[in-house]
Design a protein with these regions (language model features):
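A short, structured active-site edge motif that brings together acidic residues
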Residues: 88-101
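Conserved beta-strand positions
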Residues: 29, 61, 95, 134-137
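N-terminal binding-site loop/beta-alpha segment at the start of enzyme catalytic domains
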Residues: 1-91
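Glycine/proline-rich, positively charged
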Residues: 100-154
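Ser/Thr-centric signal marking residues that sit
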Residues: 57, 61, 95, 144, ...
Length: 154
């Protein structure tokens, strides 16, 4: 069973994020191309756990990260379930949506309320989480009013 370093918060600086109550580490880990189907699970796990052992508490994903869209969230979810679940309250997990994920009028690139809500639901399922700390829009499109996107993210 994974036991994080007891000194993990001693050397990492944390900064307040805007006007929110979040304090983000000076260094975050983005899980894009190194967390897809072509990558070794043990290496992915080592990257995440080593980062956490050194005070990295923010892990950034997106619904389309892979390769194979969604695969980074699936792999992170497995690592989270097997190792980090007891430390959920110490983590900042962010994900985003905006690129094509499924066929049909609501699965393509966009920022509609329908697309963003469905994308968030799918991301939560892939990661096995009840919530993410930050959800944001990855790619604006001219066919969705900015107000619709902003109200959905509020």
């Amino acid at each position: 069973m994974y036991e994080p370093s007891e000194t993990r918060y001693e050397t990492m600086p944390y900064n307040r994020c805007g006007k929110s109550g979040l304090r983000l580490p000076a260094l975050s880990v983005g899980l894009w191309q190194n967390f897809g189907v072509n990558n070794d699970y043990d290496t992915m796990k080592e990257i995440i756990l080593t980062a956490f052992d050194h005070g990295v508490t923010h892990f950034d994903l997106a619904n389309n990260y892979g390769p194979e869209p969604g695969r980074a969230e699936i792999n992170f979810g497995r690592i989270f379930k097997e190792n980090l679940r007891p430390y959920r309250d110490q983590l900042i997990i962010s994900t985003k949506a905006g690129y094509e994920m499924w066929p049909g009028p609501y699965g393509g690139r966009g920022g509609s309320r329908k697309y963003l809500t469905a994308s968030l639901d799918q991301s939560l399922q892939r990661m096995g989480l009840e919530y993410v700390d930050v959800f944001y829009h990855h790619c604006m499109t001219p066919d969705t009013p900015l107000k619709e996107t902003a109200l959905c993210l509020a």
